[in-house]
């Protein structure tokens, strides 16, 4: 894979991952309710789910790419539209409140329940499914080993996801007051939304 293309992929992956979603809200809540170990458990469960989704998506993509090169162009357009859609969705997002049941940290929790919840959120989240199906093909070089590129992009995505979730979990412990401010979350939504739209427009020129 071309190095500059890989950097572009990392950039899109980063902004896709750090945008607020179910997995991030779970990491924040686990950090607020429990501790960083709970955040780690749910985060590991999440990236395992992401790997399974990427494998399923890649099997279908690889088969299609061998048949039709024009399909790649179609996916490129879909991928760009998807990024723009995410941007608009982020900007108009109204779900900016994190509700806490109690105002203290729980020292005891069910680790299996934490893991299961993180895994379930990952495999039922449409965002990574659409990402792996629509964004992956944009960066694949048919002249090189598809499997090698797949593992490189997948594990890069998983690594960024793990770091992102752990960071949100850590920040929820150290900056609890900030995360509970609706204005702060609204600003974050708008900034990430505009970045998605810009990336979607730029994707059409790759």
Which residues make up each language-model segment?
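Juxtamembrane transmembrane-helix termini in multi-pass membrane transport proteins
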Residues: 3-73, 134-153
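Membrane helix-loop-helix hairpins that form the core translocation module of multi-pass transporters
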Residues: 37-113, 171
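Selective transmembrane alpha-helices of multi-pass membrane proteins
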Residues: 66-98, 161-171, 176-206
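Selected transmembrane alpha-helices and immediately adjacent juxtamembrane segments
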Residues: 111, 116-118, 123-128
């Amino acid at each position: 894979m071309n190095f500059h293309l890989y950097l572009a992929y990392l950039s899109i992956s980063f902004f896709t991952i750090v945008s607020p979603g179910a997995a991030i809200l779970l990491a924040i809540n686990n950090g607020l309710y429990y501790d960083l170990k709970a955040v780690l458990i749910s985060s590991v469960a999440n990236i395992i789910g992401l790997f399974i989704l990427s494998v399923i998506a890649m099997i279908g993509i690889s088969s299609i790419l061998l048949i039709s090169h024009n399909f790649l162009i179609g996916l490129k357009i879909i991928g760009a539209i998807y990024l723009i859609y995410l941007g608009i969705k982020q900007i108009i997002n109204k779900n900016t409140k994190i509700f806490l049941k109690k105002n203290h940290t729980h020292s005891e929790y069910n680790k299996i329940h934490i893991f299961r919840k993180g895994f379930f959120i990952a495999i039922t989240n449409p965002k990574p499914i659409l990402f792996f199906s629509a964004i992956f093909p944009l960066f694949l070089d048919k002249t090189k080993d598809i499997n090698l590129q797949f593992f490189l992009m997948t594990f890069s995505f998983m690594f960024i996801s793990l770091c992102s979730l752990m960071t949100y979990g850590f920040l929820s412990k150290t900056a609890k007051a900030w995360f509970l401010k609706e204005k702060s979350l609204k600003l974050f939504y708008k900034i990430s939304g505009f970045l998605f739209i810009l990336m979607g427009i730029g994707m059409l020129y790759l």
